[in-house]
């Protein structure tokens, strides 16, 4: 859990923004999204393979020169 020091001299909005940024950096939001539903290991591999294929196709399109 990210921790921040709240300075009483600064507005609360700045501290809240810093906390949100720290949570984003720690990956808490992504972790919650991932744990919302259970995904079987085979499904994880299938998703990863599909992402790798699409990434390779994108790289091939980008590197193709006329």
Swiss-Prot record:
InterPro entries: Ribosomal_bS21, Ribosomal_bS21_sf
Recorded superkingdom: Bacteria
GO BP terms: translation
Keywords: Ribonucleoprotein, Ribosomal protein
Keyword Signal: no
Family matches, as HAMAP family: Ribosomal_bS21
Family: Belongs to the bacterial ribosomal protein bS21 family.
Protein's name according to its UniProt entry: Small ribosomal subunit protein bS21C
Gene name, Swiss-Prot/TrEMBL: rpsU3
């Amino acid at each position: 859990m990210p921790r921040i020091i709240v300075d009483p001299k600064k507005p609360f909005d700045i501290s809240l923004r810093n906390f949100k940024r720290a949570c984003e950096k720690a990956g808490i939001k992504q972790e919650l999204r991932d744990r919302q539903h259970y995904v079987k290991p085979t499904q994880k591999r299938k998703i990863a393979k599909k992402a790798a294929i699409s990434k390779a196709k994108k790289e091939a399109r980008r590197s193709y020169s006329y």
